[in-house]
């Protein structure tokens, strides 16, 4: 998301000198809302038939918070631990990440536009600083408040900003990993980092934290050295 959104915004700013928030959010709504509404409508009859009253009330609340892109806060304050068995009765638990993403979409374009217009030469430093601070918060939070750490944008933002940094470098420097040998080798290394995390991360692994840097780096390597 960070790579794609930053690429879209920066290309528009560089090409036109301006940025249309209206068109940006229209595109996001058209991409996200139809699928979200379909899932909600498809799951509602089954929830009505099979969930007990208490679980159905929770289900209905999760729908409302999901529509408001704040379900991450709802699930945190309701004490829901992601991956716990109780999550099986919360079909919209996965929308926490969509909420984090949409919160990023609301805040990031404004910050990027202001920085680009008035502090352009510091833009990359701003992105890197945001990445480092967010990663530091995530690593601290993983040990001190793991549930809050899991659900909120300040400790998840670095994962998105990693893509933003890649997009900035590509757009401003024009580098895309043109060496064919490196293009063959490094995507495999990136895939290894991701698969290693899938196989060896477990319930005892602090996440998100410095450990999470491994799969995020893997994704970044694949993006950077891919031909398309």
Model-assigned labels for residue ranges:
Residues 1-228:
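Membrane-interface helix/loop caps of multi-pass membrane proteins
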